[in-house]
From Swiss-Prot:
Disulfide linkage: none
Cellular component terms (Gene Ontology): plasma membrane
Subcellular location(s) of the protein: Cell membrane
Major location category of this protein: membrane
GO MF terms held by the record: transmembrane transporter activity
Pfam families, per the entry: MFS_1
TM region(s), chain numbering: 7-27, 33-53, 79-99, 131-151, 153-173, 208-228, 242-262, 296-316, 335-355, 357-377
Membrane topology: Multi-pass membrane protein
Family: Belongs to the major facilitator superfamily. Drug:H(+) antiporter-3 (DHA3) (TC 2.A.1.21) family.
Organism listed in the record: Bacillus subtilis (strain 168)
Keyword terms of this UniProt record: Cell membrane, Membrane, Transmembrane, Transmembrane helix, Transport
Protein name (database record): Uncharacterized MFS-type transporter YxaM
Amino acid sequence: MSIFYSFSALRGLAMGIFSPIWILYLISKDYDFLQIGLMGAVLEIAKLIFEVPSGVFADRYGIKISIASSFFFSILTWAFFPFIDSAAICILAMIIWALSDSLISGSFETWMSRVAGEDRFGKEMMKNTQLLITFLIIGSIASGYLYSLNIYFPFLLVMVIYLLLFIWMSVFIKVPSVSETNHGDQNQHDSIKIIKESLKIIFNKKRVLLIVIAGFFTATAYDTISRYWQPFLSDLGFSEKSLGYIFALGGFTALVLLTLTIRFEKKIEKNPYLALTSLDSMGMVMTFLLSRAFRPLGIPCTAFLLAIEDIHHPIVTSYLNKFFPDSYKNTLFSLNSGVGAIGEILSGVIFGIISAAFGLSAMFVVVAVFLLIPIILYTIVPKIKDNDMKVQIEKSQQV
């Protein structure tokens, strides 16, 4: 599993460097809140367009090509960033960024599930997230300092990290193929069949469907928070360096929560709904408190909200992995991400308009109310009884 740990460390370092400052960089280039929201919407619309085709691409042509391509497009994304004074260049950067995210979305998890096996997958996913966050903290602490030295230097450094990952993945890494039993039907490589079978699994498995729908609302809420926390805290008087430290504190909070999650992994595996309900209930409370614009609450509330999505993702991914056959896994994870991308598109448009018209405080109140919907869905899911669709699909492939 060491290769996954190394990849997670480098990806976390890159994310830690650009995440705290890229919105501030847009503001420094005279983009207002509505324009930032619309650029975010462009990013998410492009993700939605690319999500399912990229999953099918990975299922047909292999995980290695998909992940290596993701790193290549990440290099291009951050190469364009210093030139986003032009709206056209900014839109192009958002589209390439979306393609990069879509190509690795689901592929990394599928690769890990093949190596770790279903029994160890959930725990290994959390360990990798833990390591990613550790290096995200390191990157975010350095981010504000690097940005204050030169606003372009952080993006150059991120390019170098993704270049290393691209060379490593392209030249030195071997990815295990899907088992032979899942290759018995040559038609499985037909893109339309892959999508049809994947949709059949989601719609016939009501528990999976409701978790995916809940993901739409959580993606909408947490994407809005991640997009607007920087200008919100900046308006409260926090400096650029302080924002980097707050982002690092969010990473540290996620690290602590992940450590607890790993410790209680077996209990969470038995009842993931309780864990998700607890997380989003706390998220709703913290978002409402943040909306009060009380400076002392800004740091702890933001840190916790930044941490939630990092805990959310491995719990949901581990849960869905149980129902996804390996031959369609990339596409299924991409479909789930695609639903989240729809929520993030609406986040950029709807909450961009709300923030421009009524201010960021009012917008965060609406976000808090939005989180009530997935909490309700989590109480419904355990009451639903479904047949094991994954077993049925895999048996049909062996015939």
